[in-house]
Amino acid sequence: MTAIIDIVGREILDSRGNPTVEVDVVLEDGSMGRAAVPSGASTGAHEAVELRDGGARYLGKGVLKAVEAVNGELFEAIGGMEAENQIHIDQTMIELDGTPNKSRLGANAILGVSLAVAKAAADAAGLPLYRYVGGTKAHILPVPMMNIINGGAHADNPIDFQEFMILPVGAPTLREGVRWGSEIFHTLRKKLKDAGHNTNVGDEGGFAPNLKSAPVALDFIMESIEKAGFKPGEEIALGLDCAATEFFKDGNYVYEGEKKTRDPKAQAKYLAKLAADYPIVSIEDGLAEDDWEGWKYLTDLIGKKTQLVGDDLFVTNTARLRDGIRMGVANSILVKVNQIGSLTETLDAVETAHKAGYTAVMSHRSGETEDSTIADLAVATNCGQIKTGSLSRSDRMAKYNQLIRIEEELGKQARYAGKSVIKG
């Protein structure tokens, strides 16, 4: 009854107005799954490859080749298979592509089909996606890591770090955590406006003010937390995504906004000082993606008390993650479905992390759609943390709203991760 009888790929637009792939999978019993694929701005060199068309159309960013792969080769390969055989379906598509980074058919094509298959199978089983993927143990609502000030590749301002996040760790529920975040976000808007800064938002819905350095941004956030009536460190923790690969040049970290250059050890010490001066509990990509020595130094320096998340470092890839585990580098992995390109490999990455005592953070991309799959996957994997942007833009709100629905549906079984995500 769950045999795949039709697959339809199409080109739609993401939150930046760029093309992306959407896929519908239809089963023999009439069940259907639909998935839209996200896209990143600051992409790691080791990520699976999005297939783009090139040429003049959409300034080279069209995805008709990927759509053609969905409707052609991929449908021919998995048509007739049972949708609940997710691992077999994903493996078939990966082998059909035949490259180590999915560059022939495109990770955007393979992922679209992979996620749509899972959604169709969940529909056939009469289950929500989080329950279908995670089983009866899926019950933990993640702490949102809310990116309320944007910099780096996500904004047109001098701030070198890409994201400044608030984590409502002291909230009793996910729903309340979202409320706390919203109140701080709107308080920050007023503080920035009163200080003469613009309150335009970046790709992920956070503000992109013309601030010179990380401490200045952090001070604005700390003041906004207190003004909104919350206690920094106790109720609201802070997180950073440095996206350090973006400003790593010739072996050094070049801060254009601060007009400073730091070598890897100085970079690690700078991050350690920020973590000591502010209630920062999580730092993502504090060092560049191939600066393994710098990563090791940072991990030895503050890894016992601070979550150190590898995004560009690990790119949701179990092989790179295992390298990091073996070397004692970082202690957490950022999980982005389109970095690796299939649901099976995504779940493998989370499982590998958890088995090694590493945390996992489910994440959006800067180019998103109304698709809320990652909200379900965060609950399905009980990973306890999610990055899905700020408290504006409907492409970000779609994920928060889905989490609110899931928490309501779980009722008394629901547990908000809260302070359990904090190390040390």
Swiss-Prot record:
Pfam families: Enolase_C (PF00113), Enolase_N (PF03952). Gene3D superfamilies: Enolase-like C-terminal domain, Enolase-like, N-terminal domain. It is found in: Cytoplasm; Secreted; Cell surface. Pathway: Carbohydrate degradation; glycolysis; pyruvate from D-glyceraldehyde 3-phosphate: step 4/5. Binds a second Mg(2+) ion via substrate during catalysis. Mg(2+) binds at D241, E284, D311. Keywords: Cytoplasm, Glycolysis, Lyase, Magnesium, Metal-binding, Secreted. Its cofactor is Mg(2+). PROSITE patterns: ENOLASE. SUPFAM superfamilies: Enolase C-terminal domain-like, Enolase N-terminal domain-like. GO terms for cellular component: cell surface; extracellular region; phosphopyruvate hydratase complex. This is Enolase. It comes from Mesorhizobium japonicum (strain LMG 29417 / CECT 9101 / MAFF 303099). The gene is eno.
